[in-house]
Amino acid sequence: VSVRPEIQSEDAGAENAAGGAEDSDDVVPDERERSLLAEGSSFRYEYADGSFAVDAWVIVDGARYYFGADGLAVAGRQKIEGIWYFFDDECRMQTGWVTWKNGTKSFFDWDGRALTGWRSFNGVKYYFDPSTAMSLRWSRKLDGRWCYFDSASRMTKGIVTWKDGTKSYYDSRGRETGGWVQSDGAWYYFDWSDGKAVRWHQKIDGHWYYFDSDYQMHTGWLKWDGVQKWSYFYSNGQQAFGTQIIGGYRYVFDSN
């Protein structure tokens, strides 16, 4: 994948990621006399005996380089022994956040390895695709459940309002869910079949409810459009039927 990144200076520590700054066990500074030789836009690494580094990690002046099968230092996004790494234009291995041109992100740990799967940074969760090490955005299905990540790849919790005005709800683990949800003092009901909030007159678990144009459950009196009829919805949202005493007055509600 050839994607030129924008390197961020964002300083965030990943939970479950190593936080040390010591050298990786796989990268050991070479104690022999060494020489970094420029070749085109890359480099070769020559040992004192005249041989060159091939398929090898080398540390020079504190910077880490990887020399491929052709003996040239690699640059850009590279997969080495199944792990993604990133090297700048000078072929130096990078750590920390990288934002790609398509808006996704990768995080390279202290040893340069890209993190994958679920990761948390300062309390914000991200999911990095195990096959690409790039963060997910928008609606994605993970482990059989829909999740939503915003434009910055951050996992979303709570109510999301879509462009068409419909709403979905994501629980504390970021999973789309259904059922009753209270938010900012209002009650909503999310259909389990599609995860969307319901509106208007709805029968739920054997009781009738009414949800307004903003998907919020209605309580109190409701006058129906186009007819001279009223209904009453208790504080729990359930519609009144039959003979009821409300506010000291007797009312009779038909079965419709």
Regions found by a protein language model. Name each.
Residues 1-256:
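Extracellular adhesion/carbohydrate-binding repeat motifs centered on closely spaced tryptophans
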